[in-house]
Amino acid sequence: MITASDALERLKEGNQRFLSGVRSIDTIVKQIQRENFVEGQEPFAIILGCSDSRVPAEIIFDQGLGDLFVIRVAGNIVAPSQVGSVEFAAERFGTPLV
């Protein structure tokens, strides 16, 4: 297990690669798409899923950044806060699918 400090550094390095356009993965976000994220988001689906780090919704559904509004919860128990997040996305973004 790595330390919290090492984990934070790893996240910062990954974010820096993303910002500079240098990626270590095959899935690439085009520059024009990244610029569109500044304007807001228009997710086409709301995913309420497991918080298991091995199951990232964007990867398992082969979708890009901004395509999904993902709410992750541990223990398969949906609390009012998660329901509120689903309601927020549906109302704010007009997302048609939960």
Please identify what each model-predicted range represents.
Residues 4, 59-98:
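Short HxH-centered metal-ligating active-site micro-motif
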Residues 2, 6, 42, 55, ...:
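Conserved active-site and cofactor/substrate-binding residues in soluble primary-metabolism enzymes
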Residues 18, 53, 79:
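Short, electropositive, low-hydrophobicity segments enriched in small/polar residues
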Residues 26-66:
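N-terminal short beta-loop-beta anion/metal-coordinating cradle
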Residues 1-37:
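Long, non-catalytic terminal segments
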